[in-house]
């Protein structure tokens, strides 16, 4: 279950530098707009200390982490919704991702040009948000034209959809994104099926200078971004893309020492994945055996058969039981045999809601 997050931002805010750092994919990064014309896609392993601990306990032949997919989408500029700055192509790429990571420039540097001539993170955020809203407004207006005809004929489904479309249109005309509209559960499902840009969850990535990362909380730009995000119920993480490039070249103890010297508790990659997980309501379960220990990503609230289906559709179709133990219980027991003897291993049925950190062996028959 690979996740996809689109990294967006105005030109020269540091998004391609960040992408290079976290994926080590080498996307071209230069001091001019549109150095990323085609989307660069990179798949990174999701760091998880629990997977390392499980590997130590089980000693499998192979360990497989879960992954996260990042797409570096070229710099959006004012007028993108009307095709400015290769806008239409970029917007279509955003439609394909699960979440949007918007990199916001929170550093001053005369050597790096800003597309609007000054550093103003809120203006940058609003510029991108408005372009996405305008693109969604156009889509909704077209949809209203088609659905409205059926609604006039008293088609119940069309009438229900039209109500949602009108709610969205009203929000867009007030320059509010779709994710701020309050829907019922049924309306929310229908709204999601419209594949609107502004219904996707957003994570703001405040990119600060190298000399500010250890005291980023006092950065005035960062404070403004956090205030803005709070009104949207959006998440914010603070990184320094240039430092992330350096961290990407280090491993193990060398990496830990470098982070300590900078006064940083975790790398930007770890922050980004943790925040994206929270944003998308995701969690991890594990399968563990002598052949392989593997991490699997699932959506919180999924039941055991659905999680089994992530491995293979046959597992879901022929689901019988899920032999389950929590990560903490397994570690405390020392191994699976001891966990079973201690009564920590449970047999769960079709209605069991899988929890983050569960270690599961699925029983199935097809």
List each language-model region with its residue ranges.
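Conserved Switch II/interswitch segment of TRAFAC-class P-loop GTPases
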Residues: 42-47, 74-84, 95-158, 171-184, ...
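Amphipathic alpha-helical transducer elements in NTP-driven molecular machines
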Residues: 34, 48-51, 64-70, 84-97, ...
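Conserved G1/Walker A P-loop phosphate-binding module
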Residues: 1-109, 141, 147
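Short capping/connector residues at structural and topological boundaries
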Residues: 6, 34, 39-42, 49-51, ...
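Short, intrinsically disordered, mixed-charge
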Residues: 24, 56, 92, 96, ...
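Glycine-rich, flexible loop/turn motifs
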Residues: 25-33, 40-42, 50-53, 82, ...
């Amino acid at each position: 279950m690979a996740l996809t997050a689109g990294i967006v931002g105005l030109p020269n805010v540091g998004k391609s530098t960040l992408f290079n750092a976290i994926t080590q994919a080498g996307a071209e990064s230069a001091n001019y707009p549109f150095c990323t014309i085609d989307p660069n896609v990179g798949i990174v392993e999701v760091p998880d200390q629990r997977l390392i601990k499980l590997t130590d306990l089980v000693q499998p032949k192979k360990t497989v982490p879960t992954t996260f997919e990042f797409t570096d989408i070229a710099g959006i500029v004012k007028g993108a919704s009307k095709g400015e700055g290769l806008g239409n192509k970029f917007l279509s790429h955003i439609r394909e991702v699960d979440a949007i990571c918007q990199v916001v420039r929170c550093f001053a540097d005369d050597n790096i040009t800003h597309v609007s001539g000054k550093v103003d993170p809120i203006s940058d955020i609003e510029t991108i948000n408005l372009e996405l809203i305008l693109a969604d407004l156009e889509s909704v207006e077209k949809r209203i034209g088609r659905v409205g005809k059926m609604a006039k004929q008293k088609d119940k489904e069309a009438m229900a959809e039209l109500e949602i479309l009108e709610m969205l249109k009203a929000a867009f005309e007030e320059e509010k994104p779709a994710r701020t509209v309050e829907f019922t559960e049924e309306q929310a499902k229908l709204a999601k099926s419209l594949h609107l840009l502004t219904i996707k969850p957003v994570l703001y990535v405040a990119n600060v200078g190298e000399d500010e990362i250890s005291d980023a909380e006092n950065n005035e730009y960062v404070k403004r971004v956090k205030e803005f995000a709070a009104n949207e119920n959006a998440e914010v993480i603070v990184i320094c893309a240039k430092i992330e490039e350096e961290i990407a070249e280090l491993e193990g103890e060398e990496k830990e020492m470098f982070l300590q010297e900078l006064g940083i508790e975790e790398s930007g990659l770890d922050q980004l994945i943790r925040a994206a997980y929270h944003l998308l309501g995701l969690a991890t379960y594990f399968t563990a055996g002598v052949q392989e220990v593997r991490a699997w990503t699932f959506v919180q609230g999924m039941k055991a058969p659905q999680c089994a289906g992530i491995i293979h559709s046959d597992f879901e179709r022929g689901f019988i039981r899920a032999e389950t133990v929590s990560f903490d219980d397994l570690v405390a027991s020392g191994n699976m045999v001891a966990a079973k003897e201690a009564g920590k291993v449970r047999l769960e049925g079709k209605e069991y809601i899988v929890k983050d950190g569960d270690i599961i062996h699925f029983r199935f028959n097809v």
